[in-house]
Amino acid sequence: KQHLFDKKHTQFLSKDLRNPNAVLEISEEVPAPDLIVANAGVTLHGRAGSFDVDKKANLYYLLCGGVIDLIESYLPEMRERRSGRIVIISSIGALTPMPKSSIYSSAKAGIFAYGRSIHQELKKDNIDVTVSLPGYVRTAAHKRAGLDHLERQIPSWMWITAQQAVR
């Protein structure tokens, strides 16, 4: 599924980042942008050790490997022009235990660590990196992933809407 929108020099491109080839397609189709917002937010629900190998690999690549590959594909151009901004959307799950969401949590921890590392590294290239760790965002994703019990277990004051998360 792809949407390419160009209005006032802004492009939005949607690809299936579970597929490493899609990441390459993006960097071939769109020159290095001024701003990259890397956000992947899906999960699997289940006990550790019970995940289907392919589903686990696809999810981990989407949440961590695909995000890193996308950013890495643009870094040479951003470094060459000595400018850019990268926003990586991780999760509070990178810092807190998430029973029955271990793949999600570990992948979000991976991009959190990656983002903090490249933040230090890219300062000298005038490229700004921000890693966001939103808390519990109320979306249909929890229900689809079989995690609707979270709404009962986590106090309501800890939840935010998607609109609040993007502010």
What are these regions (language model features)?
Residues 5-19:
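Rossmann-fold cofactor-recognition segment
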Residues 39-44:
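Conserved NAD(P)H cofactor-binding loop of Rossmann-fold oxidoreductase domains
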Residues 47-59:
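Substrate-binding pocket helix/loop in short-chain dehydrogenase/reductase
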Residues 49, 98-102:
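Active-site loop immediately N-terminal to the catalytic Tyr-X3-Lys motif
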Residues 71, 107:
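Active-site helix of classical SDR
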Residues 91:
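Residue(s) in the substrate-gating loop at a strand-loop-helix junction
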Residues 120-167:
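SDR active-site lid
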